[in-house]
Amino acid sequence: MAAVRAPHVEEQRADPRAFAEGQEASQRLSPEHLCELVEAQKYEAERAIASLRADWAYWWDLWANRVRYPGKEDWQSTMWVPKPFAAVEQATALTQRSLVDSPEFFGIDGGDAPSKVLAKVLWEPLTKLALGECGFREKFVDGAKVGYILGLAGYWKFRWTMTMVPTLMGASLDGVTGRIVPSFAKTPRSALALDFVLPWNVFRDPDSRPRDPFSGSYIVHSEWKDRALLMRMIDAGWDRDAVEKLLATDGTSSASRTMTNSQQQQAQRRQQSWERHKFRKSYLLDEWYGDVLNEHGDPVMPDAMMTVSGRHVLYGPAENPLWAVDVNSGRRKWPLIACSPLVHPD
């Protein structure tokens, strides 16, 4: 069987018709191939930094003062000055005081006089409001703290969300009790949301370059999610048949070769025990961004996204909804932005 082919990547980025051909070609790829592609890339990313991930676990325990030294009694192991913890807390406090507690921790400027005025009276206040509503200041400090512990602060994930909120429509007087009874109606409200993602849950192309968060050919964000979220995402355009087939399983097969013990490890970092009641089932979802490759490894569709779980393609391949383009790589930006206070030069 001949491999699925499409116009060249650069041609697809320049010509909408060529991109449509590439998107159509990606739809002809089997779900088994797409799931295998995501799994292979995740496994590649995980194995490439396996030793670093082991160091993360050690450094986390070192910061939490959970280190035991062989050849010493328990009381001797615990009788030490927690210098890593103190250093991290002091650095975090300095970051918060110098960057976050300041009312002018960032600014927006323009190139000419009209744009400067527009930036001052519109864009800067609007951006500050959006960042304040999504908790950017607090999550920035959390990321800096993780960065001082691990050397990698993790990832900030910006997304646009919409929810239904109650809005006061009026009030009436209760003739029996004399109380004022308000009336509400559900109205849609959209807002900027920000998730802070720990580095354990992100699998990035090992060929990515430092200080260039959109380099590399793929990035995967993996999270365990409950059944309720998957059922709700059917109305958001996910594949109903694929979601229902996934929900018919117990969720254990969705982990495949990666993150098989991630829930237990996350609970251990929180100093918790991992136990779930029999009515709660969770499934490992992989949100993938990158270039879709065919059976021979040739790019079929650039700047794509899809969501898979185990052997089920729940959404996509679809066009990356972010229209911002990274000038260094020429690709669409993905919503995950990495940051590190301790940058490795290579």
Give names to the regions the model predicted.
Residues 1-345:
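Extended, helix-rich architectural segments
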